[in-house]
Design a protein with these regions (language model features):
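N-terminal beta-strand motif that seeds the catalytic metal site of vicinal oxygen chelate
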Residues: 1-26, 79-82, 86, 132-135
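Vicinal oxygen chelate
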Residues: 2-7, 16, 37-40, 93-135
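Core segments of cupin and vicinal oxygen chelate
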Residues: 8, 15-63, 98
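A structural feature recognizing the 12-helix transmembrane core of secondary solute carriers
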Residues: 24-25, 29, 77, 93, ...
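Short hydrophobic/aromatic beta-strand element in the GNAT-like acyltransferase core
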Residues: 46, 66, 116-118
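Mid-chain, well-packed structural core segment of small domains
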Residues: 74-99
Length: 135
């Protein structure tokens, strides 16, 4: 087992692409009972998904995560990805680069949530980093 950091950072969110967010919302609501919240154009028409009972801090059940769907486009990743919670986004951007990853775009502010950026790991997987507000 490989372990370098004294602190482990948890997966707190998942993302999947969707061609039709209305259709995908209906599918996951009908099959799994998930609740959805369609955000506006200012948030990229992102579709938030609650997979378990949640409040403003997130899922109430320990270990559970919520997620979302983004518009599937030719230049966006076409596979699911995860978001990892960190306590210092700038520091982790540097760690990603130093370890051989590539930052995808610029960090963005998600109102009332936190700072977010995506990266590609050494295998080409798209992963998100989130520094929640209040950290």
């Amino acid at each position: 087992m490989q372990k370098q950091n004294s602190k482990m950072y948890p997966v707190v969110h998942f993302e999947m692409p969707a061609e039709d967010r209305v259709r995908v919302a209906d599918f996951y609501t009908r099959v799994f009972g998930w609740e959805t919240n369609q955000l506006g154009a200012d948030m990229g028409n992102y579709l938030l998904v609650m997979t378990t009972e949640s409040d403003k801090k997130g899922p109430k059940k320990p270990g559970a995560i919520n997620g979302g769907f983004y518009q599937k486009t030719p230049d966006a990743p076409s596979c699911p990805s995860v978001v990892i919670k960190v306590d210092n986004l700038a520091q982790h951007i540097e760690k990603v680069k130093k370890a051989g990853g590539k930052i995808l775009g610029e960090p963005m502010d998600i109102p009332n949530v936190g700072l977010f950026v995506s990266f590609a790991d050494t295998e080409g997987n798209r992963v998100g980093l989130m520094q929640p507000y209040g950290q």
